[in-house]
Amino acid sequence: MEQLWANKYRPQTFDELVGGAKELDYLTQSMQHLLLHSRGAGRGKTTLAHVIAKELDYTIHTFNASSKKTRGIAFVEEELIPLTSSGNRNQIILLDEADQLTPEAQSALKGVIENAHGYFILACNDISKVSDWIKSRCLQIHFLPIGKEAMKERLEYICGAEGVVITYSQLNLICEAHEGDLRNAINALQAFAS
């Protein structure tokens, strides 16, 4: 089975990031807990977390809080507390879909974040579901939709790398249909090419 292009062409460095995210390279100079948020998927939140980890040569532990297993207090107590108590300061704990954590789990995170060895990066689509306490302890970065020109540029790069011939109007349609969600636009391009 062919690799998804969204994964194959996922940026590995700040220079490869699309849109405003590439301006965030200063984050590696003074690492802190981060809360990355947007009003939609495919904006680069998770990718930014992985780029930061790679640039700092930190281990990254990724958890998706949208599953029943990882959104409750048991997950915080059984997984996160031991992980952040390990003494490894060169690690990032990425909680994707952090807005799906239960209020109890978010409350339990309070002590974990305060005493963590390493750094938390929380990514979410609905910041209103994240507790005020977490918001106050993290640098908040809002991700805007990826601009149409930046999307086109990235899709054109992928077309060149994959040998895909596409018209300007077809490329435009893909960008317009996916309104700032680069991941879905790349998936649509791959479907078009196959």
Region locations from a protein language model:
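P-loop/Walker A NTP-binding region and its immediately flanking N-terminal helices
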Residues: 1-150, 158-160, 168-176, 184-190
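Loop-to-helix "switch" segment enriched in basic
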Residues: 194
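Inter-helical turn/loop segments and adjacent helix faces that build the functional surface
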Residues: 163
